[in-house]
Swiss-Prot record:
Substrate binds at L134, V135, S136, G137, G138, D167, G180, N277. Binds 1 Fe(2+) ion per subunit. It is found in: Cytoplasm. The lineage of its organism: Bacteria, Pseudomonadati, Pseudomonadota, Betaproteobacteria, Neisseriales. Its EC number is 2.3.1.234. The gene is tsaD. GO terms for molecular function: iron ion binding; N(6)-L-threonylcarbamoyladenine synthase activity. Fe cation binds at H111, H115, D305. This is tRNA N6-adenosine threonylcarbamoyltransferase. Gene3D superfamilies: 3.30.420.40.
């Protein structure tokens, strides 16, 4: 079965082909980062309009890369939510229009389920059950995943997501949008011994996290350094970035290990854009190796939003496919409301 997947929940337009026998056939992606940089963040109206401009050319490019035509498709999957309403409507409209014209079914996909399942696009792929660390700009959660649609929340951030904290702290330090990846790169040249920042909720009995206070801690540190030394230079900025990243990484690693211990599981899956962070990967790899835990990541190119994860999730939910026509979007959508799937593709 060949599934075409559309992702348009925020500021990436993604299209992909997934074959239930062969795996990922092709994928195409356009990011709007440069367009939104002028405004210092995502502008929903501009995001929606850019999805409209990009989605058909990307679909054509994806089909050409895979050597397929529309007539080869068996189903179409699209991100139904959560996300920006206008952006979601673009993917939903195109998916349903194509499916209606081709007389093939559509599959509504939860964006976060796409992220949770995305490491299955790697080789080797994880087997169920596993603990998942979902860490992105909008979400930071630890979940026990027993199968498709079988998700138990073990812990989550009580305020800012880790990726959101990266972006906000980067802006505070004068880095251009999108600042999170720039902060991570700058941290690599920072001195880990120069500054220390708090590790919020590191030793709490639960598996919840909190990152909003780190921004205040960074601002306090920056203000103190500027009072003592004047405007911060590039090395000092890198040292502050390193201290910030060390704090986030230590919390994520300790909470992940706590989730593994609580569940007794021996597989950890890391998904979401922050999952591409090299220091986080290195720390998780080392900690899991000491405990004989397998750790899995999506390919680096598929850590951020993409159509491949939506096509995969759609393929694994083929039994929920339905006729095209009337459709809805869900800008807010609780992952726990998804039905379980038995015998997924």
């Amino acid at each position: 079965m060949l599934v075409l997947g559309f992702e348009s929940s925020c500021d990436e337009t993604g299209v992909a082909l997934y074959d239930t026998e062969r795996g990922l056939v092709a994928h195409a992606l356009h990011t709007q980062m440069a367009m939104h940089a002028e405004y210092g963040g995502v502008v929903p109206e501009l995001a929606s309009r850019d999805h409209i401009r990009r989605i058909i050319p990307l679909t054509q490019a994806c089909l050409a890369e895979g050597g397929k035509t529309l007539a080869d498709l068996d189903a179409i999957a699209f991100t139904q939510g959560p996300g920006l309403g206008g952006a979601l409507l673009v993917g939903a409209s195109v998916a349903n229009a194509l499916a209606f014209g081709l007389d093939i079914p559509v599959i509504d996909v939860h964006h976060l389920e796409g992220h949770l399942l995305s490491p299955m696009l790697a080789d080797p792929a994880p087997a169920f059950p596993f603990v998942a660390l979902l860490v992105s700009g909008g979400h930071t959660q630890l979940m026990a995943v027993h199968g498709v649609g079988q998700y138990e929340t073990l812990g989550e951030t009580l305020d800012d997501a880790a990726g959101e904290a990266f972006d906000k702290t980067a802006k505070l330090l004068g880095l251009p949008y999108p600042g999170g990846p720039l902060l991570s790169r700058l941290a690599e040249s920072g001195d880990p011994a120069r500054f220390t920042l708090p590790r919020p909720m590191l030793n709490s009995a639960d598996l919840d996290m909190s990152f909003s206070g780190l921004k205040t801690a960074v601002l306090t540190l920056k203000t103190r350094v500027e009072a003592d030394l004047g405007p911060i230079d590039e090395q000092t900025r890198a040292d502050i970035c390193r201290a910030f990243q060390e704090s986030i990484v230590e919390v994520l690693v300790k909470k992940s290990l706590g989730a593994l211990k609580r569940t007794g599981l021996k597989r950890l899956v890391v998904a979401g854009g922050v999952g591409a962070n090299r220091q986080l990967r290195a720390a998780l790899d080392a900690a899991c190796a000491r405990r004989r835990v397998e750790v899995f990541y999506p390919p680096l190119s598929l850590c951020t939003d993409n159509g491949a994860m939506i096509a995969l999730a759609g393929a694994m939910r083929l039994k929920q496919a339905h006729a095209a026509g009337s459709f809805s979007i869900k800008p807010r959508w609780d992952l726990s409301s998804l039905p379980p799937v038995n015998g997924a593709a």
